[in-house]
């Protein structure tokens, strides 16, 4: 389904979770997924609809799962994980009438997620286990996991944490989040040889053991108003260091998320808003 071949009009829903916005397509009827060109076209904020990512809802792939979904970044590249997107998929399914239960399963490209409705336009999603082993993030040049990695970045020494939440994340702790060099360091880290699949880069400031501020420079999208998997990544890295507790609020430019990781070796839970902005028709 490309720009030239897509059948117009194309119905869609615009959704957002803490300002991280999505164009959601219902492809449960077997319609082919969008190609790179169409995703980039839909995501364009001037000539298309405009979003950080495009989500396609597809038929379930497993037993007990209500729906599956795929995610693409604004540049058309595929994404493996998106916590805000998962909540928006859940909200879309509830609004559509596809699910009536307070607890249900949805399939992302990397795993099934248990979702709970916890209030009006509020959802909690199990994000799975954080992965700290370098080869599984992937992070090259470091045989063993550690709390902090030291990288050379154009003559600078940069210290960061690294973790996979189904997608790779680097976490840089800063003193003042408002003046952090998010775009410069973020783009350099995404091109660094240590991250062969590129990386989402989070810049985090600890306010107190239960509260942090975060900005995220995402693969294929640049800085976004919020990043759910990035919030989880920053929180678990800080938890591993003993910098915050096991239940932390993460304040991003677009809103506040809650990350809970009760025990190491257990799943991480991400909670926050997910709302429909509008339904629309795209005419190409």
UniProtKB/Swiss-Prot annotation:
It is an enzyme of class 5 (isomerase). Belongs to the diaminopimelate epimerase family. It catalyses: (2S,6S)-2,6-diaminopimelate = meso-2,6-diaminopimelate. Homodimer. Catalyzes the stereoinversion of LL-2,6-diaminopimelate (L,L-DAP) to meso-diaminopimelate (meso-DAP), a precursor of L-lysine and an essential component of the bacterial peptidoglycan. HAMAP family: DAP_epimerase (MF_00197). Its main location: cytoplasm. One of its GO terms (cellular component) is cytosol. Substrate binds at residues 20, 53, 73, 83-84, 167, 200, 218-219, 228-229. The record marks 278 as: Important for dimerization. Pathway: Amino-acid biosynthesis; L-lysine biosynthesis via DAP pathway; DL-2,6-diaminopimelate from LL-2,6-diaminopimelate: step 1/1. Pfam families: DAP_epimerase (PF01678). GO terms for molecular function: diaminopimelate epimerase activity. This is Diaminopimelate epimerase. Its EC number is 5.1.1.7. The active site is at residues 82, 227. Keywords: Amino-acid biosynthesis, Cytoplasm, Isomerase, Lysine biosynthesis. PROSITE patterns: DAP_EPIMERASE (PS01326). The record marks 169, 218 as: Could be important to modulate the pK values of the two catalytic cysteine residues. One of its GO terms (biological process) is lysine biosynthetic process via diaminopimelate. It comes from the Bacteria. It is found in: Cytoplasm. It comes from Xylella fastidiosa (strain 9a5c).
């Amino acid at each position: 389904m490309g720009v030239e071949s897509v059948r117009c009009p194309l119905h869609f829903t615009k959704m957002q979770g803490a300002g991280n916005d999505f164009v959601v397509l219902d492809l449960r009827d077997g319609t082919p997924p969008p190609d790179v060109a169409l995703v980039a076209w839909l995501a364009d904020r001037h000539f298309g609809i405009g979003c950080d990512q495009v989500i396609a809802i597809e038929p379930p792939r497993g037993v007990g799962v209500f729906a599956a979904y795929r995610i693409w970044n604004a540049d058309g590249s595929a994404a493996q994980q998106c916590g805000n997107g998962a909540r928006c998929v859940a909200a879309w399914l509830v609004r559509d009438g596809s699910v009536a239960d307070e607890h249900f399963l949805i399939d992302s490209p990397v795993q099934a997620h248990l979702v709970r409705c916890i209030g009006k336009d509020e959802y909690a999603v199990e994000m799975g286990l954080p992965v700290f082993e370098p080869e599984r993030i992937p992070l090259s040049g470091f045989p063993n996991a550690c709390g902090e990695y030291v990288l050379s970045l154009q003559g600078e020494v940069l210290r960061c944490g690294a973790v996979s939440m189904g997608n790779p994340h680097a976490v840089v702790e800063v003193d003042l989040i408002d003046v952090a060099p998010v775009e410069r360091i973020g783009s350099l880290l995404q091109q660094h040889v240590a991250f062969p699949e590129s990386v989402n880069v989070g810049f985090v400031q600890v306010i107190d053991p239960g509260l942090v501020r975060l900005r995220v420079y995402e693969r294929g999208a640049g800085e976004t108003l919020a990043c759910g998997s990035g919030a989880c990544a920053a929180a678990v890295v800080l938890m591993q260091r003993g910098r915050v507790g096991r239940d932390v609020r993460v304040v991003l430019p677009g809103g506040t998320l809650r990350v809970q990781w009760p025990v190491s070796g257990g799943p991480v839970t991400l909670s926050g808003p997910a709302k429909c902005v509008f339904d629309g028709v795209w005419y190409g």
